[in-house]
Amino acid sequence: TAMFSVSLSLIPLFTEKGMTYELAALALGLLGAGQVIGRLLYMVIPHTAAPWVPLVTTTGLSAFSIALLALVPGPPWLLISIGILAGAVRGAQTLVQGSAAADRWGTRNYGAINGIIAAPLTIVTAFGPSLGPLLAVATGSYSSMALMAVGLALVALIFARFS
């Protein structure tokens, strides 16, 4: 949810840092391209580690890339590059989430098990589009909201290790 909220708030985050609306919108599109890169990278890496390792890795990289988005003031080319990195992490995270049940419990009853895992995550994620702007207003900036998202990602990192 942290990565989702920040991703959806990328345009106001980047305009707050001085980008034009058009360039920030292009950056959001390139974040989407980064998701494809992350999914392709996930497909080619070996999957021999313990099941919790991919989740911890993508969650840690989420916290790192969100922190960069929050703290780096510019220039635009660097912010866009960080956005692409965040997209790659988000893309890989999608596949990690999709394979989590099978990696831990096999493919028997995959649909039921994955549904149990995905249901609470889907409910929380549904609030992502509104939580980002609400937190930005409450904290005074989208950068502050992104820093709060880093905190959430770090809490998720602790839980991910014991999943």
Please place each PLM-identified region on the residue numbering.
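Multi-pass alpha-helical transporter architecture, strongest
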Residues: V150-S163
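Helix-to-loop junctions at the C-terminal end of transmembrane segments
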Residues: G38-P51, A136
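Extracytoplasmic gate region of multi-pass secondary transporters
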Residues: T1-L40, G128
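Helix-loop junctions at membrane interfaces in 12-TM secondary transporters
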Residues: L71-S81
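Structural signature of the two symmetry-related core transmembrane helices
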Residues: V53-L68, V150
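Intracellular juxtamembrane helix-capping segments at the cytosolic ends
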Residues: A92-W105
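Interfacial helix-cap and linker-helix signal at transmembrane-aqueous boundaries
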Residues: F14-T15, I45-P46, L131-G140
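A membrane-interface helix-boundary motif in multi-pass transporters
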Residues: L134-L152
